[in-house]
């Protein structure tokens, strides 16, 4: 078992380094690799702010990567990425929204737009 950092995720998605990108992909293919919940928001941020990826491309790239790694709550991650690609919220707000819709967790916020999304988006079935 290996925990992978954001650099591994980025090298696999970006394929921007002749030496490191294939190495990163090989690490994912030949090991049971875990991604901590904190790594995905960092990858989302870097892909958007540093590399200029749009929301849909970010969500698609990370969703394509998920079968290669173990994520603690993959269902939550998938839903948050889907919200991120479809709604105009920061990724962390999408995680909060996904927690509310999947598990009924209450969210305290001063963000009226997020509050409205919590009130109007339907819950997601766990089954």
Region locations from a protein language model:
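Active-site-proximal, substrate-binding regions of enzyme catalytic domains
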Residues: 46-68, 75
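Active-site neighborhoods of divalent-metal-dependent phosphate/nucleic-acid chemistry enzymes
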Residues: 70-110
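Alpha-helix C-terminal capping segments
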Residues: 24-31, 62-66, 100-101, 118
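Short, well-structured N-terminal submotif of metal-dependent ribonuclease cores
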Residues: 1-35, 50-57, 127
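Residues that scaffold the ATP/ADP-binding catalytic core of kinase and kinase-like folds
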Residues: 11-13, 46, 117-118
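Acidic, PIN/NYN-like endoribonuclease modules and their adjacent C-terminal/linker elements
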Residues: 1, 97, 101-127
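Alpha-helix capping/helix-boundary segments
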Residues: 8-9, 39, 76, 95-96, ...
């Amino acid at each position: 078992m290996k925990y992978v950092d954001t650099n591994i995720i980025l090298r696999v998605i970006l394929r921007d380094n002749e030496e490191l990108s294939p190495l990163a992909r090989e690490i994912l293919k030949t090991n049971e690799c875990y991604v901590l919940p904190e790594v995905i928001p960092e990858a989302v941020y870097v892909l958007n702010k540093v590399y200029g990826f749009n929301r849909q491309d970010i969500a698609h790239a990370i969703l394509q990567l998920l079968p290669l790694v173990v994520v603690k709550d993959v269902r939550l991650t998938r839903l948050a990425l889907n919200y991120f690609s479809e709604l105009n919220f920061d990724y962390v707000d999408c995680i909060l929204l996904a927690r509310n819709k999947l598990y009924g967790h209450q969210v305290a916020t001063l963000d009226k737009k997020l509050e409205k999304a919590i009130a109007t988006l339907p819950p997601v079935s766990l089954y």
